[in-house]
Structures are given as C-alpha cells and as structure tokens.
C-alpha cells in the first residue's frame, strides 16, 4: 500500500481443483490437469484506493478456458476447448460516505464469458436452441460467449439500531455465435438487507431479492425471488 493505493494481482493454475476434462453427469467438463494449457486458468490485476470518505477500485480479469478430453463410447473425441476466445472483464467502482448514507456504484464490461445476468451458456431458455446432434446436452457449440455490460447502484444507511443496505442491478448482454444472429437479453435485479447487532460480535440479518432475465427476441423470462435470514458471530 502506498499513498492510499493498493495493487493486487492474482493467478490460478486451475480454477476448480475438483473439476476434470471428462464427460460425466450428462455434461461436458472443460478443465484438464493443473499447470497445463488444458486446465481452466484465471488471472486478475486491480488497483484500489481509500481517501477519507471516498474509495475506488478498478481491475481487469482474464479467463483462459480449458479443454474437454473425453473419448466417447462410439469413438468420437472430446469437444476440445470450451471457447477459443479468452474471457475478459474490466470493472470500475467506488463508494462515498456522506455520514447519513454511504453510496456505492460499479460498472463493468465483459466479453467471451460463460455466464452473466442469471444466464449460462447452453441454456435453452433464451434465444434459439443450439443443440449438438451427437450429444443433445451440449448446446454450446458455435458460441463465442456472452458480451455486454453491467451496472450496480447501492446504498447503506443506519435505520434504528441497525443498518439497511439496498441495491439495484442491470445487465445488458448478448450471446454471440459464429454463424447465427446474436441472442440478446437483459437482467434486472433489486435487493435489500437489514443487519441488527446484538452485541459487538453477534448480529442478526434478514433480506430479500428479486431478479429477472428476459430474452429480447422471444420475450422468455426467468425470474428468481429469495428471502433469507441468519445470525453471524465473529470469534
């Protein structure tokens, strides 16, 4: 840390040590041996700073997709690399404490991702269905991944003896294909959470959230509502 700034760098030789490069449970897996180019790898670098009531963070993330090495019973080889392009994401965010309320904001841009806005590659819920005739469970073929941007705006304010935190989320993205039109979709989300301290080390919390992903072309929607509560104790 220097002059309020902190630089952070990360690298993973395999993002999931328990994953492999086989065909099992009705799905392809795309992560070979750790330390090889067949494993899914991850790297990131970020810069953050704190200056009184203001703070910020900016960063870049890179995903090197792995390879499926499975040999099918009929002699067909595995499906190769999950995606030919590397996944990339950049983000910029910050917060400011106005004493009566703390405001948060973040924006990000991404491309060649496998998931965004509640949608995952291979899902048949949005856009045209792309199915591999040799394996109906594999509908990723020909995809260049998800591309788009996301925005987040949130705030935290004291309420009674506790703190209320709320947030709004928006993602505009599309799944790009090599030989077919893009499948466009949008995600909208809202959440709220209340934290009530029982002591210096123990607190109760309760919250709720709602999210909706909508396909622009077909109008199909996928909605999720959640309500939760719990207790936190710090030892």
What are these regions (language model features)?
Residues 190-209:
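C-terminal closing repeat unit and adjoining cap/tail of repeat-based domains
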Residues 8-12, 57-61, 106-108, 167-169, ...:
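Transmembrane beta-strands of outer-membrane beta-barrel proteins
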Residues 1-4, 53, 160-161, 198-201:
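Short loop/turn motifs that connect adjacent beta-strands in outer-membrane beta-barrel proteins
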Residues 88, 212, 224-225:
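Extracytoplasmic/periplasmic mature domains of Sec-exported, cell-envelope-associated bacterial proteins
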Residues 14-39, 65-82, 115, 174-176, ...:
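Surface-exposed loop and membrane-interface regions of Gram-negative outer-membrane beta-barrel proteins
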């Amino acid at each position: 840390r220097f002059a309020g700034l902190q630089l952070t760098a990360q690298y993973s030789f395999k993002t999931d040590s328990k994953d492999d490069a086989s065909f099992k449970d009705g799905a392809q897996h795309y992560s070979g041996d750790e330390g090889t180019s067949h494993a899914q790898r991850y790297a990131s670098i970020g810069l953050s700073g704190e200056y009184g009531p203001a703070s910020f963070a900016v960063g870049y993330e890179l995903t090197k997709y792995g390879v499926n090495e499975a040999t099918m019973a009929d002699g067909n080889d595995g499906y190769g690399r999950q995606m030919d392009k590397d996944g990339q994401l950049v983000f910029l965010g910050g917060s400011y404490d106005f004493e009566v309320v703390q405001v948060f904001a973040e924006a990000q841009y991404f491309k060649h991702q496998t998931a965004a806005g509640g949608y995952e590659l291979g899902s048949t819920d949005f856009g045209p269905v792309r199915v591999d005739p040799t394996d109906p469970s594999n509908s990723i073929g020909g995809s260049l991944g998800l591309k788009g941007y996301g925005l987040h705006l949130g705030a935290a304010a004291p309420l009674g003896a506790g703190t209320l935190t709320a947030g709004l989320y928006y993602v505009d993205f599309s799944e790009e294909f090599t030989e077919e039109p893009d499948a466009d979709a949008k995600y909208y989300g809202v959440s709220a959470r209340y934290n009530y301290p029982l002591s210096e080390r123990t607190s109760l919390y309760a919250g709720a959230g709602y999210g909706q992903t909508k396909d622009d072309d077909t109008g199909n929607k996928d909605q999720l509502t959640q309500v939760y509560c719990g207790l936190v104790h710090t030892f």
